[in-house]
Amino acid sequence: WCVGHLVTMSYPEKYDIKFKRWSFDTLPFLPREFKYEVIPGVQKQFEIVKGLLNREDVDTIYVCTDSGREGEYIYRLVAQMAGVHGKKEKRVWIDSQTEEEIMRGIREAKDLSAYDNLSASAYLRAKEDYLMGINFSRVLTLRYGNSVSNYLNTKYQAISVGRVMTCVLGW
């Protein structure tokens, strides 16, 4: 089972070591294809899930991640990284954790392909968050990092920009 996210998008230096150093010369960072990797702290759990998904005696996988875009994204990334092929995949969509609701969800499980648009929207949202965060954090840090650190009388640090962070904190 997944315990939250097991897979994440790779940092720019995984594409090319030149991106490890923050510089205006390497911006904007816009990869043609996105790279993913297992989150180091959950590698053991990923290997367990990968082993279960790829068991030869399993022909149907019931996807029971949270019912929503993020749950869909979590499973699709794990299946992608685990190399799941040739299995029937059914999506269990439930609104509560009662036994009755869980049984209904299993009985009425749809082919995973019925949720392809939801999956596509999740991948798109993740790519947008990634590109905005990587590029704007680097631009603002390179341009204003020293000024902000001097003003706050703190050690130089990155200025983080993100979709959720920016609106929640009012930045």
Regions found by a protein language model. Give the residues of each.
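Prokaryote-biased recognition of long, low-complexity C-terminal linker/tail segments
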Residues: 129-171
